Amino acid sequence: MVTITLIEDPDGGQRRLFDDWAEVFAADGRHLFGPDHTSRSAAELREMNRGSDRHSISWSAIDGDGRVIGAACLVMPQHDNLAQGGINVVVHPDHRRRGVGSLLLEPTEAAARAHDRTLLLAETQWLAGGRDESGEEFAARKGYAGAQTILRSSLSLPADRARLAAASTAAGDGADGYVLRTCWDGIPEEWLAGRAE
């Protein structure tokens, strides 16, 4: 038996549950891409949820032994695109094709409806030259259609650390003309000219 549990306190009483929830995403990433996966850690996901630019709701699928075998979330922008919701439904690779994804999708879609999110966005991924193992077929059966293909590329840095250090501290490298600026919870008005958000 699988139980779907709402995660309401990822920093306190449900901290371990949230960590196990995040691990489902990492297990999926490792399954697909090995050590080159881009899944975020539980700490990174907690931090992302602290901003005021989005509201996230998360659920875990827990099996009869108390293990988290699936994870879902609905991410809703709060400042623009207010009809949009990003959904993520992931089942641990060892527990797929048993209905867990469908169980997780139900509360995710219900929450989207309750928050008037009429445009749901999701993504799936696979290695170049391969095929999607489960996401596209699952989504199609649930009424979703593919709309955009995005290529993910990775560039391995040279292993020569001394060469990297020299390049980053080289005199006359042109870095003096650049400034790194960071903002939280949206882009300041004065930065918006010429940018799309």
Model-derived segments and their meaning:
Residues G66-G70, S134, A147:
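Glycine-rich acetyl-CoA-binding "A-motif" of GNAT/NAT acetyltransferases
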Residues Q78, N88-R97, W126:
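A short, internal acetyl-CoA/4′-phosphopantetheine-binding micro-motif in the GNAT/acyltransferase core
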Residues V91, R97-A114, E137:
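Conserved acetyl-CoA-binding loop-helix of GNAT-fold acetyltransferases
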Residues Q84, A112-G129, I150:
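Conserved GNAT acetyl-CoA-binding A-motif
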Residues A140-A162:
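Active-site/acyl-donor-binding loops of N-acyltransferases
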Residues S56-S60, R67-M76, G86:
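Conserved beta-strand in the GNAT
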Residues M1-M48, S60, A170-E197:
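Short amphipathic alpha-helix that is part of the acyltransferase structural core
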